[in-house]
Each structure stands twice: as structure tokens, then as C-alpha cells.
Amino acid sequence: MKVLKIAAVAVLVIGLSSLVMAEGMKRDAMTHSKKMMQPPFGTKADVDFAKEMWKKISKAGFLGVHGNLYVGGPPHGKVREVVEGVVDNKLVIVKSNYGGKGVSIKSVTKDPKKYLKAVTVMVKRGGYDPDNKDWFWVKYAPDGTVLKNKKGMQLAGRVAKGMSVGCISCHQSASGADFVFSHNKTVNASVTWIGDKSLKAKFADLMK
């Protein structure tokens, strides 16, 4: 009788252990499923990071005209300017995009606020997206609001990852394998470095 009781207890323990393991596996599967379902961009974490980055690039002097305006085509502004520098030990590239009736280098120089349509930013975040050179992408309105695509998704994070059209797919074609067109030797743009110029050498390998 005693042996039977011990056996029954053992069976119960094994059963409970199996149940606990099953529940754990179920939770892991659900967590994995949620991660798989999570969009590559536009999450709360992405937007929060983008908002903080806007404050920092504004304070660091990345916004406004610095004198290297040039003409370009879509999807960016007809007139644009690229500046780069380091914020929080991260390489940051800021492109101001100008457009509208009468836009030209001369008109933008005279009244940049009138023609500014969007500010697009790339932030190098170590380990963020190894498949795509660890760039964080974001598109702002002139007032710093994170803009949305036609589906209502906020354009911050791994924007359009895995899609045939969008930031990542377009920049993959940039020469030098760094996803940055303004580092191309043939591009018709000069890039202004903002802030401590000694940091430029430190980040030189990221700008080839």
C-alpha cells in the first residue's frame, strides 16, 4: 500500500512537472510569435527614440542651413543638405529636404523655413539591425513630428525592412556598402561635419 502511494505521488509530480514545462513552452512560443508579428518600424520604442534624437540633434546644431545645399531627385527634396556628426557616441546623418513652388538653392538660402518639407535622419546604433549596417531611420516633419506612411505607420526604426520600396531597399544600392549615398565619390554633395571634428577620424571606417 505504501509503495502504491509513493508511486501515485511520483506520477503526480511528473504530471505537474510536465504541465509546468508545457506552460513554459507555450509562453515562449507566444513571446516568439509576438516578436515575429511586431513590425520592423513604427513601434513605441522606435518613436520614443526618434523623439529623443530630435531634441539632441536640435540642441547640437544639426538643423538649419549650413551652406552645402545641392539639387537632387526624389524621394528626397529637390533641394537638400546633408550634415553629419556624433551624438551620444553614435554617428548621425541629417538630411534637410526642401521643396515647393519656386524652390531653388537661392530661394532656400534666403528663406529655408518656407521650403523645408521634411528632415530625414540615419543613426548608427550598434547591434540594432546587423542585416542593414545597424542604421536607425526616421523621417520628421519640420516641427520634429515623426511622419507616417500611407498605412498610418510612423516612419521610425527599421523603415521598410524586407520591402522592395523604402529607406533600406533604396540605400542598399549606395556604393561603399555603407548605405550612405553622400559618402559616394561621385555624388554632387559636400557633407558638413557638425561638432567635434576630432571625432570624424574615430568614425572614419563608418564613412567609406
Predicted regions and their residues:
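Bacterial N-terminal signal peptides that target proteins for export
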Residues: M1-A8
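Polar/charged alpha-helical tracts
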Residues: K2, A45-K55, K197, A201-D205
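Hydrophobic helical h-region of N-terminal Sec-dependent signal peptides
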Residues: A8-S17
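Homeobox/homeodomain signature
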Residues: A10, K44, R125-G127
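Sec/Tat signal peptide C-region and signal peptidase I cleavage site
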Residues: S18-A22
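N-terminal secretory signal peptides
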Residues: G24-S104
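Sequence context surrounding c-type heme c attachment/ligation sites in exported
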Residues: K26-Q38, K90-K208
